[in-house]
């Protein structure tokens, strides 16, 4: 199974918080874990924000960042190409998504087209984004883009 993770799920791999165990299980069950290249900057920003807000100590931030840096090359990363960003723009309008969420959804769609919707799962903490991914999966299946 190929698992696509957005940044909210990716962060849960490096910071223990509610839902981390679920994401760890999904990742351990996946043959491939994919994400957008934009998740790198988003994850680093999220870790820094958690430190600023006091949710992470300095040493926990250092450990999380080091582990993330070591594991980043293991992810299948999708580039935010012009065509992918244009598709993301369409998805943002269709599903009322924020910009980076729509990039994650467009990246997931690309992964699902390559691996097949039957063999691809989407993971996010964001309910709206999860619902959009479910609707998009049904559309891809219905139109034969699986």
Where are these regions (language model features)?
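Anionic, Ser/Thr-rich low-complexity intrinsically disordered regions
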Residues: 25, 35, 58-63, 67-78, ...
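Short active-site oxyanion
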Residues: 30-33, 74-76, 116-121
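Short glycine/serine- and small hydrophobic-enriched flexible loop segments
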Residues: 45-52, 109-113
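Amphipathic alpha-helical segments within well-ordered protein domains
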Residues: 8, 48, 89-92, 109
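Short beta-strand scaffold positions
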Residues: 5, 35, 79, 99-102, ...
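Acidic, PIN/NYN-like endoribonuclease modules and their adjacent C-terminal/linker elements
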Residues: 2, 106, 110-146
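Short, well-structured N-terminal submotif of metal-dependent ribonuclease cores
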Residues: 1-39, 50-63, 138, 144
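Acidic catalytic patch
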Residues: 40, 72-95, 102-107
